[in-house]
Amino acid sequence: MAELSQLLEFLHHGNTQIRQLACDHLVGHSSDPTVFKKPQLVPVQDLKLLVRDYPPIAKNALTILINISHDSEIFENLAADDAFVETLLKKITDPKEQTADEIAMLLSNLAKSDHMEKLINLERALPAKTVSTSPYALDQLLDCFVKGANGTLNKHANFDYLAYFLADLSKHKVGRDYFLSRRDYDVVVPISKLTVFTEHKSHVRRRGVASTIKNVAFEVDKHPLLLSDDTETIDGVPGVNILPYILLPLAGSEEFSEEESANMLPDLQLLPPDKARDSDNDILVTHLETLLLLTTTKEGRDKLRKVQVYPLIRETHMQVADEGVREACDRLVQVLMRDEEEAPKIEELDEDEKIEEIF
């Protein structure tokens, strides 16, 4: 224990090599947050400062903070520290930052705090033009996520964990409004930037994006925007054309009758023989629940019937041997196949059937 206390003292040592050695050793103790809480969270304060240190030290400091941030006291200390959050924002929006992915992970943890809601409308300094031309923090992070997939913005990062960060912010009404409103700087509705990632190779990215799409679907008045084709405009804004991006992860290589296939969305017709549905059953359930939310209005139900969603869900039910997926399929099919006068409303579902925002 004395050795551990000494290591904690070394976190603010003047010698770089000693700080690095201390961080290296303390990563192995980060499964126990209590180690870093005494006295008065001083080690946590030291770690926050080390995030600005040389990359090897900063990476270890961030790894420790990621691991201990599930502790409620440490979690609140980090999320409520505006100066520290600004440090994270400054670094993650630097296209040369070597610890950008670790920062994305930490932000995804901190996004569960209501303190982080302030980032939705927070203005800050502009980053490099290659990153974003918006003065708003959330725009900048979204641009990192979109442009940085596969290391195309920062060779050290893919920003995948920002998917969880975005999903958490979409739990808030102000967050959903953000994702569904056209931004001035690029004249794009943010949710339309995310849809292309529903079939991305990164499981983290697919899962977070699916959750974000589901959460914004709670805004029933925006369903026309979500369901409209991108060649249509709703209140002067191009439609998001959300359906193909929800349905494709649910689609496998099954063949449909000529009549069924002819009425499906173009993206769902003539899929390759090696087409595989998403392998994560939780993601499948998320997409199925999004579709159920989109049946809240008669217009939504009519749209899903028109584009032959039922045959696709039928095959998903048959091919996926998972109780959660099959239950979600059943709930959706009941709505799609029911006579209109019997059609239920989402808000009238039994308590144990209610769909909730996730993350």
Question: How does the language model describe each region?
Answer:
Residues 136-155, 250-282, 325:
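Acidic, Ser/Thr- and Gly/Pro-rich intrinsically disordered linkers and low-complexity segments
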Residues 14-15, 53-55, 95-96, 154-155, ...:
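Short inter-helical turns and helix N-cap capping residues of alpha-solenoid HEAT/ARM repeat scaffolds
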Residues 1-5, 37-45, 78-86, 123-126, ...:
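Core helices of alpha-solenoid repeat scaffolds
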Residues 301-345:
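C-terminal interaction modules of eukaryotic adaptor/scaffold proteins
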Residues 6-12, 46-53, 87-92, 144-150, ...:
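Alpha-solenoid HEAT/Armadillo-like helical repeat scaffolds in large eukaryotic proteins
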Residues 31-38, 71-77, 114-128, 150-153, ...:
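Alpha-solenoid ARM/HEAT helical repeat scaffolds used for protein-protein interactions
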Residues 342-359:
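Acidic, serine/threonine-rich intrinsically disordered low-complexity regions
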Residues 9-11, 15, 19-33, 46-49, ...:
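Alpha-helical solenoid repeat architecture
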